[in-house]
Amino acid sequence: QTPEYVMIMNEMIHDARIVRIDSAHVSEEIRKWLGDSIGWWEGDTLVIETTNFREQTGLLVASRNLTVTARLRALDGGHLQYSFTVDDPTVWTSPWSGDYVWVKSGERVYEYACHEGNYALGAVMKGARLLEGEAGSK
C-alpha cells in the first residue's frame, strides 16, 4: 500500500487487484479480468469502485455494465469488514449487496500451484522419470 495505490491479492492464482486512490476510471474500452478499480477514503473506510470488467469475468451473470462497489474497514485483531454492492442494470432489476469479515489468518501466502495437495504427484513424477530414462537408453 502506498498513498496512491492499494493492492488486494488473492492467494488463488495470485490475482492481484490494483486500486488507484483518488483517480478516475480508464476508458470504458479498456477491459480487464478483474475490472478497473479506483478508491477513495470515507473516514476509516476505503471505498473501491470497480468497473470495466471483461465480459468473460467468470461470474455466472454479468454484462459490460457491471459495477461493484466495495467498502473495507479495519476491525480489531487485524480483521477487515468487507461490504459490497453489485450493480448491473442489464442483468439485475436492482443492485444487491452482501458483507462478511475477512479474518486475519496469521499464515503466510504461498505460491499458488495446481499440484499442491495432489498426493499422487510423486507417482506422476516417478513415472515421468522412468519414461525419460527409457527414452534415453534407446
Regions found by a protein language model. Name each.
Residues Q1-K138:
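Hydrophobic small-molecule pocket/channel-lining residues, especially in calycin-type beta-barrels
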